[in-house]
Amino acid sequence: ERARGLGDVYKRQISKILSIGIPAGVENGMFQFGKLAIQSTESTLGTQAIAAQALAIVLENLNGIASMGVGISLMTVAGQTFGAGRTEEGKYYIVKLTWYGEIGLILSCLLTFAVGRPIMYLAGMEPESMRMCYEMLVAITIAKPLLWALGFIPAYGLRAAGDVKFSMIVSICTMWFCRVALAIYLIRFQGFGPIAVWIGMFADWGIRSIIFSIRFMSGKWMEKHVI
């Protein structure tokens, strides 16, 4: 009888773990498929555009390290507070760490922009590739501090509270309808260069920011429970 009771407890725990892990895995898998779709379209732009885009992605990843770290830490902090039933404290940390992430993002973007051109020279890029890469870096430096933080950092807190299905649906829809579809349309039908990928990405970030802000303020995500 005791073994059966422990088995039921373990089953409930495993089902709760899977209820978080499976949507997160699906979200990440769809994201990788989306990246492949974009890269296949980028390959039609020529080697100079591909080289410019490759370095722009590296620089964009570099300026997002600090904020991404804040988001990951938020998942841990928020998970502990919501798990202990301290909902208001969890909301406080979501807001506070989102602001910290925004400040870190602004500083990181400015620093990356300052060292961007020297890195391009060190990479030995051709003039045309350097021009395209610099244009993309300027666009990223302007758009990312405005759009990224609200679209990603609060989502970590919502996932920690158990609102994983909503996050998965939003992420997949914005990924495919904004980032992928818009980029492919601009490149294949409007003749845009690699900047089209970033226009699609900015649209993705902006719509995510609006949706997750509305979701957070509505309080519906607090109706979800992990334990």
Q: What are these language model-derived features?
A:
Residues 107-134:
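Short membrane-interface helical motifs at transmembrane helix boundaries
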Residues 29-62, 80, 118-127, 185-189:
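Helix-terminus/linker motif at the lipid-water interface of multi-pass membrane proteins
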Residues 59-61, 127-151:
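Alpha-helical transmembrane segments of multi-pass membrane proteins
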Residues 11-37, 41, 62, 66, ...:
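Hydrophobic faces of transmembrane alpha-helices in multi-pass small-molecule transporters and flippases
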